[in-house]
Amino acid sequence: MLSEVNKISKNFAINQEIREKEVRLISSTGEQLGVVSGRDAQRMADEAELDLVMISPNAKPPVCKIMDYGKFIYEQSKKEKEAKKKQKVISVKEIRVSPTIEKHDLEIKAKNAKKFLEAGDKVKITVRFRGREAEHSHVGVKILDSFLAQLEEVCSVEKPAKLEGRNMIMILAPKKA
């Protein structure tokens, strides 16, 4: 929490840190007071017992606002937390199978994949070939096709089956509701 406040507070110059000759001033109520000298703006903030905060340093002249700086930092950190909450992290879950997998085992793996997809995660299915099994890549394609057939109502193919080294990989994404 404290580090977030420090990050936010470094972005804004306040009170004596503002060395501009002229600034565009906004009062604590949000009223435009126009362009005033930096000293006058600081004096007005002191009279109101509030802080002078430079909101937009790149503007000509820079925009400053008279406000309670502590409250401003609190509001900014609250906005950042709210924005973070709204971001959904999509993870990729991997399910590994061998080319000699039995039908029942494949069904169980498909059920697990379905749970992941319903939770909103992507699923990466890997068929791992060992030794001479790599010569029979068509078996891997059959396995991935039967896997997909069991899940077609809850997923879409993001990346079709492709042989990468000794692994055949297919990535499934949840269907948009």
From Swiss-Prot:
SUPFAM superfamilies: Translation initiation factor IF3, C-terminal domain (SSF55200), Translation initiation factor IF3, N-terminal domain (SSF54364). GO terms for molecular function: ribosome binding; translation initiation factor activity. It comes from the Bacteria. It holds the Pfam family IF3_C. One of its GO terms (biological process) is ribosome disassembly. PROSITE patterns: IF3 (PS00938). InterPro entries: T_IF-3_C_sf (IPR036788), T_IF-3_N_sf (IPR036787), Translation_initiation_fac3_CS (IPR019813), Translation_initiation_fac_3 (IPR001288), Translation_initiation_fac_3_C (IPR019815), Translation_initiation_fac_3_N (IPR019814). The keyword Transmembrane does not apply. The keyword Protein biosynthesis applies. IF-3 binds to the 30S ribosomal subunit and shifts the equilibrium between 70S ribosomes and their 50S and 30S subunits in favor of the free subunits, thus enhancing the availability of 30S subunits on which protein synthesis initiation begins. Monomer. Belongs to the IF-3 family. This is Translation initiation factor IF-3. It comes from Clostridium perfringens (strain 13 / Type A). The gene is infC.
